[in-house]
């Protein structure tokens, strides 16, 4: 199978509901959409396919596979600039071995901040940081919820 990393990443970037991409041997590409994993309609990935995709990831990131070759997991960031038919994007990548084969999880990092209303944050919490509605909130700022 001749699978291109750029095509997979483009599909994830263009769908604003996709947060993660899973590349695991024995399954098709899987994407987490609104918290639910869904398989992409494409052939199942074989270990060779995963190896080729991981190679493309490392080439794109201009990163050596030292940690991976030493038997360790590897975590790093990946930025891809805008190209013809590709909007560009930023990603967090984790490459690891699973059941004797390579696997990867890629988190899509959005350029824009999500809409607080879409996140389901209660209005009372938003009011702590927002002065746009004339609340004269002089102490507005960052609120951490742990």
Please provide the spans of the model-predicted regions.
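N-terminal "pre-motor" subdomain/linker immediately upstream of P-loop NTPase catalytic cores
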Residues: 1-146
């Amino acid at each position: 199978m001749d699978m291109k990393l750029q095509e997979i990443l483009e599909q994830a970037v263009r769908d604003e509901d996709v947060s993660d991409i899973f590349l695991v041997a024995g399954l098709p590409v899987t994407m987490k959409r609104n918290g639910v994993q869904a398989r992409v309609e494409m052939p199942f990935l074989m270990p060779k396919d995963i190896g080729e995709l991981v190679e493309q990831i490392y080439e794109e990131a201009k990163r050596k596979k030292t940690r991976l070759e030493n038997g360790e997991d590897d975590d790093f960031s990946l930025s891809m600039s805008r190209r013809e038919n590709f909007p560009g994007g930023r990603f967090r990548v984790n490459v690891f071995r699973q059941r004797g084969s390579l696997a990867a999880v890629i988190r899509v990092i959005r350029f824009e901040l999500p809409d607080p209303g879409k996140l389901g944050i209660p209005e009372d919490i938003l009011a702590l940081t927002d002065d746009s509605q004339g609340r004269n909130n002089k102490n507005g700022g960052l609120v951490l919820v742990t």
